Amino acid sequence: MTCTVLHWIPVFTRPETVNILLDSLSFLSQEGLKVYAYVVLENHLHIIAQSDQLEKDMLRFKAHTARKILMLLRERNIHTILDQLAFYKKAHKTDRKLQFWQEGFHPEWISDDKMLKQKIEYIHQNPVKRGYIDKPEHWRYSSARDYSGQDGLIEIYKQW
């Protein structure tokens, strides 16, 4: 699945905003979400996960993280991002002044182990393809560290 900040605004350049995402994923893991892999880039994140109520979990994730990140941006008076989120808000979102996430989360069905491994490799390569790092495990906000034997930032399920 991919969750993207509205208009690809680079919000996840601050550790505090990424920590909100990771804390939320950790909480949902305790509630039954199995996170197999993730990568957080500056304006979106990829998650490979499984749950009996995946759509509900992702809606909870997006609602909670949007609320917490917007609160943080307001507390820090980061008006450039807040103004962009207000400007690009979808017109039909009349119940709010700001929109944080693009609509949807674009889930893809993973049918077997081979496909799962391909998807994990693909998302872990994202920061490498962008030229940010040389090896996937060098990206701090990625489960590639877990798969290379290092300690990651959140619990990852490696057995599927």
Task: Describe the residue ranges of each PLM region.
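Short catalytic/metal-binding and nucleic-acid-binding patches
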Residues: 1-160
